[in-house]
Structure formats: structure tokens, C-alpha cells
């Protein structure tokens, strides 16, 4: 399945920078928030096209939406999906995502 270049921006929302994600970077695994409708092959294709790297594997997590309350009104935060992408050794994605490091 070929994706249009306009669709690439919509699938990957942002990289995740947490303690766990930082530890995973040392193992050549990078964490991204992605569109909940995205599949593993779509995520792999997008990462390989945008960053020009070789993806070995992808693990995804569907995180639940959380209940939020403002005054007497109860609402929900939107649900989201997180992808942990494993790259081949020596791939230069870190320089693209974090140029200051």
C-alpha cells in the first residue's frame, strides 16, 4: 500500500521523550505517538520514508482514553496509540530527531 506524502505527516504525531523512551534509545528503539488507525506496515513505511532508515520491528500500544472532569462536567481525553520502532544498528535517526545531543 503506497501512501501519499501528505498522509505521512498525519500518521506520526510526535516523538515521545520520557525516561523509559530515553533508555530505549540506547537500545536503538524509538517511541512515537501515532494515529490510532495506523497499522504496523503503515508505520514502518512512514518511518522508512521520512527518516531513510531500515526498520527491524514495531511494537504498538493502544492506550485507553482517560476520564477528565471540569467542574460538574465529565469528559474524556482522546485515545492514542504509541509505537516503539526498532532500527538496525548504526541508523542515524537520533541526529534527525535530537540534533543537539
Swiss-Prot record:
Where is the secretion signal located?
none
The keyword Transmembrane helix appears for this protein: no
Q: Which Pfam families match?
A: Ribosomal_L23
Family matches, as InterPro entries: Nucleotide-bd_a/b_plait_sf (IPR012677), Ribosomal_uL23-like (IPR013025), Ribosomal_uL23/eL15/eS24_sf (IPR012678), Ribosomal_uL23_CS (IPR001014)
Q: Which GO terms describe its cellular component?
A: ribonucleoprotein complex; ribosome
Q: Which SUPFAM superfamilies does the UniProt entry name for this protein?
A: Ribosomal proteins S24e, L23 and L15e
GO biological process terms, alphabetically, are:
translation
Superkingdom per UniProt: Bacteria
Q: Which GO terms describe its molecular function?
A: rRNA binding; structural constituent of ribosome
- Alphabetical keyword list: Ribonucleoprotein, Ribosomal protein, RNA-binding, rRNA-binding
The protein's job, in short, is: One of the early assembly proteins it binds 23S rRNA. One of the proteins that surrounds the polypeptide exit tunnel on the outside of the ribosome. Forms the main docking site for trigger factor binding to the ribosome.
Q: Which family does it belong to?
A: Belongs to the universal ribosomal protein uL23 family.
Entries under PANTHER family matching the protein = 60S RIBOSOMAL PROTEIN L23A
Q: Tell me, how does this one assemble?
A: Part of the 50S ribosomal subunit. Contacts protein L29, and trigger factor when it is bound to the ribosome.
Name of the protein described by the UniProt record: Large ribosomal subunit protein uL23
Amino acid at each position: 500500500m503506497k501512501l501519499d506524502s501528505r498522509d505521512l505527516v498525519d500518521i506520526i504525531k510526535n516523538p515521545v521523550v520520557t525516561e523509559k523512551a530515553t533508555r530505549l534509545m540506547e537500545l536503538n528503539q524509538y517511541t512515537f505517538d501515532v494515529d490510532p488507525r495506523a497499522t504496523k506496515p503503515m508505520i514502518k513505511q512512514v518511518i522508512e520514508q521520512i527518516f531513510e532508515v531500515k526498520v527491524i520491528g514495531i511494537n504498538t500500544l493502544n492506550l485507553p482514553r482517560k476520564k477528565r472532569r471540569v467542574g460538574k462536567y465529565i469528559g474524556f481525553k482522546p485515545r492514542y496509540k504509541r509505537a516503539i520502532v526498532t532500527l538496525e544498528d548504526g541508523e542515524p535517526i537520533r541526529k534527525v530527531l535530537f540534533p543537539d545531543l
